[in-house]
A protein has these predicted regions:
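The beta1-alpha1 cofactor-binding region of Rossmann-like NAD(H)/NADP(H)-dependent oxidoreductases
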Residues: 52-62, 94, 209-210
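Substrate-binding pocket helix/loop in short-chain dehydrogenase/reductase
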Residues: 88-89, 93-101, 185, 196
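Active-site helix of classical SDR
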Residues: 112, 148, 156
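Alpha-helical segment proximal to the catalytic Tyr-Lys
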Residues: 117, 161-165, 224
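Residue(s) in the substrate-gating loop at a strand-loop-helix junction
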Residues: 132
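Short C-terminal tail/terminal secondary-structure segment
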Residues: 137, 216, 227-239
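Short, small/polar-rich loop/turn modules that mediate ligand/substrate recognition or access, typified
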Residues: 164, 169-171, 226-228
Length: 239
């Protein structure tokens, strides 16, 4: 098993991408703290639910302290929690902008500001930030989401430099998914799904498990020489 005896925190883990990652990590031997405001939609051995709002900095510190006290370390952090509130810029409200930035960007900062230094103290670790193809290329009607995910990419590259500067192997990478068949996508009309699939070289949408497998690689020792990288998992959307 590739994550045996590893301790992992996965945010936004109630379902979807986060749920797929939490369950795969557990099957690969990790003990997983699955973080979300909503209860988990699955049961999985070695996955522990922890209720948390990532916009609350002190709650993020409390989670870090809890994991350290219970397990003595944190090996893997996946910052996956995120939302969308789409609108054209001229119609986007302050509330829509602030909520997306607070959860998608500030939430990533809030948890990593505590977990990253702990990983340095403990001798290493892997931080994986879930970005998006929208953060790389932008998208009409998603100014807030695009800004938040572009910010996540910037944080990833900054932390890859900051947390490794003392010679401690704390790696920080991002995954930029394309169109993935999550519960949110299942509400999209069939004709649009076909259009999205046609934008890829592989002619289909991705599955949550495919993002989870990418995260497993970055979390494992197989990626021991990979840091500061943005791994695009999008079926060849932007070739």
């Amino acid at each position: 098993m590739r994550l045996e005896q590893k301790i992992a925190i996965v945010t936004g883990a109630a379902k979807g991408l986060g749920g797929a990652m939490a369950q795969l990590f557990a099957r690969e031997g990790a003990k997983v703290i699955a973080v979300d405001m909503a209860p988990l939609t699955y049961e999985c051995e070695n996955v522990e639910y922890y209720s948390l709002n990532v916009t609350d900095s002190q709650a993020c510190k409390a989670l870090t302290d809890y994991a350290k006290e219970k397990y003595g370390k944190i090996d893997i952090l996946v910052n996956n929690a995120g939302i969308t509130r789409d609108a054209m810029t001229r119609k986007m409200t302050d509330e829509m902008w602030d909520l997306v930035i607070d959860i998608n960007l500030k939430g990533v900062f809030n948890l990593t500001r505590y977990v990253g230094p702990l990983m340095e103290e403990m001798g290493g670790g892997s931080i994986i930030n879930i970005a998006s193809v929208v953060g790389e290329y932008g998208n009409i009607g998603q100014a807030n989401y695009a800004a938040s995910k572009a910010g996540v990419i910037g944080l990833t590259k900054t932390w890859a430099k900051e947390f490794a500067r003392k010679g401690v192997p704390v790696r920080c990478n991002a995954i930029a998914p394309g169109y993935i068949m999550t519960d949110m996508m299942k509400t999209v009309p069939e004709d649009l799904l076909k259009k999205f699939a046609g934008l890829t070289m592989l002619g289909r949408l991705g599955q949550p498990e495919e993002i989870a497998k990418a995260a497993l690689f970055l979390a494992s020792d197989d990626a021991s020489y990979v840091t500061g990288h943005v791994l695009s998992v999008n079926g060849g959307m932007r070739l």
